[in-house]
Amino acid sequence: MGSKGAYRYHWQSHNVKHSGVDDMVLLSKITESSIVENLKKRYMDDYIFTYIGSVLISVNPFKQMPYFGEKEIEMYQGAAQYENPPHIYALADSMYRNMIIDRENQCVIISGESGAGKTVAAKYIMSYVSRVSGGGPKVQHVKDIILQSNPLLEAFGNAKTVRNNNSSRFGKYFEIQFSPGGEPDGGKISNFLLEKSRVVMRNPGERSFHIFYQLIEGASPEQKQSLGITSMDYYYYLSLSGSYKVDDIDDKRDFQETLHAMNVIGIFSEEQTLVLQIVAGILHLGNINFKEVGNYAAVESEEFLAFPAYLLGINQDRLKEKLTSRQMDSKWGGKSESIHVTLNVEQACYTRDALAKALHARVFDFLVDSINKAMEKDHEEYNIGVLDIYGFEIFQKNGFEQFCINFVNEKLQQIFIELTLKAEQEEYVQEGIRWTPIEYFNNKIVCDLIESKVNPPGIMSILDDVCATMHAVGEGADQTLLQKLQMQIGSHEHFNSWNQGFIIHHYAGKVSYDMDGFCERNRDVLFMDLIELMQSSELPFIKSLFPENLQADKKGRPTTAGSKIKKQANDLVSTLMKCTPHYIRCIKPNETKKPKDWEESRVKHQVEYLGLKENIRVRRAGYAYRRVFQKFLQRYAILTKATWPVWRGDEKQGVLHLLQSVNMDSDQFQLGRSKVFIKAPESLFLLEEMRERKYDGYARVIQKTWRKFVARKKYVQMREDASDLLLNKKERRRNSINRNFIGDYIGMEEHPELQQFVGKREKIDFADIVTKYDRRFKGVKRDLLLTPKCLYLIGREKVKQGPDKGLVKEVLKRKIEVERILSVSLSTMQDDIFILHEQEYDSLLESVFKTEFLSLLTKRYEEKTQKQLPLKFSNTLELKLKKENWGPWSAGGSRQVQFYQGFGDLAILKPSNKVLQVSIGPGLPKNARPTRRNTVSSRGYSGGTNNNYPMRAAPAPPGCHRNGLTRNQFVHPPRASGNQRSNQKSLYTSMARPPLPRQQSTGSDRLSQTPESLDFLKVPDQGAAGVRRQTTSRPPPAGGRPKPQPKPKPQVPQCKALYAYDAQDTDELSFNANDVIDIIKEDPSGWWTGRLRGKQGLFPNNYVTKI
């Protein structure tokens, strides 16, 4: 639940270097140029995240950034957005907390062009949610699957393109499902449009899917032998584009990650081997080449048939037959007839490629199903959805795949517009909120151009119609499609045609699509002959990948790839609309993929088409937060007695009551017909802080009661265990032998300045103010803290130079790891003195709670070392001193402490040169034990007060200074990864391994080496969408919500600040000299209650004078 009472000890943005503005709503000038300049300034200083209200802008740094470790996870967990610099962890934490508190599904839509960093952003969100959510072994298993699904799906679904070295060639919507307690206990992946054509063809300079290169680089010698793995240029499919290696990708290491991921997900070793067999089989399939014999295709070299047949478990002759011929069914009248058709070379190559594409797609679907089955749960409760989908892209030659990819991105842009620009403004009108509309470009016109069914029909409808009417025709279908497009939508302002294709004016710019293969790829039909061939495999696993029932009659029009992606896109939109959305807008700063390289025109183009300027204007003029009355009352009911546990009256009046209870200014909110609208994020933060403080207070009451109950039960046993350490060895004090053990005698909850020295999640076992004696036996007070890991001695010093000169600050004097303590020495008398012995030097300390301290220290020492801590008892103790830096003659030396029988219960100390003499009267016998009777509470921190005022007196005007802030530097060690399962060495096939034939030519030999133009990498022409953006009417300078009426003069008493005061707790006011403060309540304690700049809190009355 956040940082509770120690907000000022969080690492806050004002403690680090500022670069531009964190939230672009605060920009003084709202233009594309000022947005680009702010992003550039931050990017060059390695700040890749920036806010627009709650929207996160992320610029791809093209390098590993240092702020994604355990320290940052701790920093952002439970913290409000304004407390820390912009970060993807803040957005992830907001999603997770809102899901738990509001009981609503959340989703994050990550958008941006190819190479902008969407996939990496999705990984960070999933890893953060996995890290901060709790759970036992079963939950941990689900977390492991969530995290390991990434490398597995990337291996089979990602590839290097000219724009991105790790480009997602499929779309993915990952739902992490949670129990009501916020533990991830299930998940589900929906995948969209795998670009399977990449297996058999791609642009120059690109690669196929990573798994092919991983297998060749990472397979063991035994695997290479059995799978026929050799050099990359041996395989036609890989040599097509002439690109094998990628600078920042280690295929050998990634192959081991892929195998480990399959193990974690629960894919059996036999299935893993079969998956790799199919991957190798695809590569060998590509090496089958054809020649023309009498106008028909024949296999050029039949020895290349043997290895793919062997790996896929099929007959070599059947493979040859199905690649060069096909059974076609024809109907004449009422009769059906099957005709055997021999294929030409082009058709045979197409058939071979169709089989290779189908094999890869079916394996990919198998992996997705395996992941889903491993995370399956019988019912859904709450979930967080992460949308990681291929980015908008433009290549030298753009085909059907790019058309589908850019259509999905067009739909995502529409969602953003609908929810952040259009719906927000319409909501103000519906709710009766005063508002001046802000114009923007709505890309719905482009979506309709692509997906509309009628009046006029969209491109996809026309494409499906052509495919249906020309289903038996291979040639000429693409030109027919182009002609129909020109006839039906040729006049559309966002559409143009050219001799080989058409142009769409997308929101992100003009894209030229080549018609070649459009209809064939849209049909996406796998011939029955190939399904029969794979069903004839001797391997049940491969058979299971092709479950089609070939005997069933095919009725109706077959589903096309275009209609499938359109349905998937619309289903995705429906799913996202049911969730509370969050947005990450990814920006690609350059095409070189190098850090610190900034292309101004490219970034400006993205800023324009992403609509960031309009987003800032709507956010700035509008309301940061809106909620239906009932939900608002439910969330903040705990703030007042009248609303808790339920408000009995009119919901609108209940909301107004809550807002007035926190003294929110009336110009900071409006009440609509069914919702409350809050303007400034700071006002919302005030509500959240008050709510958190209430829950924190009640939680402390419950904790205190429970701890008291547990303590009463255990303290007798604890005292007895502690006394056993000293039994028959040391005399005991009469007043302390039966006392309770408190542990915290300082009140650490009220002293965050001491907590800064301890790890944030480190438990404090013992805290007390002790006396520490130096080499001259001069006593000085120290705070002694004991945790399971370390012992701390903290002192105070006055700062001698710098901006904090004159301030007294806490200083860590000594930190000893528990296992480094050698022994502890004590006398046999009833005194409170003990010596901690350590390798370097000893510490002479005095504490009235030594018995309790020693019992806890011995327990922690045993946990760390599995040994008993040596305790030495003698009336002459040796003390080893610290070496002083006084040159070559420096020496630590030693001192002696001698104990004598004296009078009274207070020890009398007499230092004499190098000896300290301690005399004290006799105590209880050494064999004394605590009794089991009830005892009165010993001195210690009570843990609370009976009023809301600070326990300290009101501070004197300037002269007393509060302690400074120190940033917490504790970092958890990284978790070691487990051992990975060894590679599989044997194949699952009964066939004998055939010899590997020599490849006669590579794919690059078969392709014409024409030089490729790189013009497509330039910033695209903005087209009609850009023109529409430029011509949208601008609102008047004071557009948006009308200026509120001036507030009436206050009728409450006021005072003027004589001096500046910095709040030292969350319920206090900070103010500057000459500030005017409204006085709410005067109190004799010296702490008055007042209100300044919309915040109510306590302040010292001797810093002000009444007006």
Swiss-Prot record:
Keyword Oxidoreductase belongs to the record: no
Modified residues (Phosphoserine): 1001
Subcellular location: Cytoplasm; Cytoplasm, Cytoskeleton; Cytoplasmic vesicle; Cytoplasmic vesicle, Clathrin-coated vesicle
Disordered, as annotated region: 920-1052
Binding positions for ATP per the UniProt entry: 112-119
SUPFAM superfamilies, alphabetized: P-loop containing nucleoside triphosphate hydrolases, SH3-domain
GO cellular component: actin cytoskeleton; adherens junction; brush border; clathrin-coated endocytic vesicle; cuticular plate; cytoplasm; cytoskeleton; microvillus
Expression sites by tissue: Detected in brain stem, brain cortex, cerebellum, stomach, colon, heart, lung, liver, spleen and kidney. Detected in utricle, cochlea, outer hair cell bundle cuticular plate and vestibular epithelia (at protein level). Detected in cochlea and vestibular tissues. Detected in kidney, lung, spleen and intestine.
Any one GO molecular function term: ATP hydrolysis activity
PANTHER family noted in UniProt: MYOSIN, UNCONVENTIONAL MYOSIN-IE
Subunit structure comment from the entry: Interacts with CALM and F-actin. Interacts (via SH3 domain) with SYNJ1, DNM1 and DNM2. Interacts with ARL14EP. Interacts with CARMIL1.
Protein name in UniProt: Unconventional myosin-Ie
Natural source organism: Rattus norvegicus
